[in-house]
Amino acid sequence: MPTIQQLIRSQRKKVEKKTKSPALRGCPQRRGVCTRVYTTTPKKPNSALRKVARVRLTSGFEVTAYIPGIGHNLQEHSVVLVRGGRVKDLPGVRYHIVRGILDTAGVKDRSQGRSKYGVKRPK
């Protein structure tokens, strides 16, 4: 506990909040170009082949982003929109690719939770 005299001499240090998505530089989303599209396995106790992509963002960062939903049309040089949001069982994956915008197609035959997967309302 500092004395009054110590507080007069120097103020209390402000606790700075550390961002969980530094590559976005404070923006809600960023555009990027896929440099590699591949699958990876989650950590224990889960088992799957998760679809991820290495993306070079306009902010200059190269990040690993998760491709949500069933099936995708992404390949190298695809232009994608990246948002924040980690994948709990994939270490180092702190971003998601937004479906249904730029080069990323929406999920086929999706009827529930459509807005999260870039699917228009079926006629």
From Swiss-Prot:
tRNA-binding among keywords: no
Localisation per UniProt entry: Plastid, Chloroplast
Domain of life: Eukaryota
Keyword tags: Chloroplast, Plastid, Ribonucleoprotein, Ribosomal protein, RNA-binding, rRNA-binding
A GO CC term assigned to this protein in UniProt: chloroplast
GO terms (BP aspect): translation
GO molecular function: rRNA binding; structural constituent of ribosome
PROSITE patterns per the UniProt record, alphabetical: RIBOSOMAL_S12
HAMAP family in the cross-refs: Ribosomal_uS12_B (MF_00403_B)
NCBIfam families cross-referenced by the UniProt entry: rpsL_bact
Family: Belongs to the universal ribosomal protein uS12 family.
Quaternary organization: Part of the 30S ribosomal subunit.
Function of the molecule: With S4 and S5 plays an important role in translational accuracy. Located at the interface of the 30S and 50S subunits.
Protein name, UniProt field: Small ribosomal subunit protein uS12c
Organism: Chlorokybus atmophyticus
The encoding gene: rps12
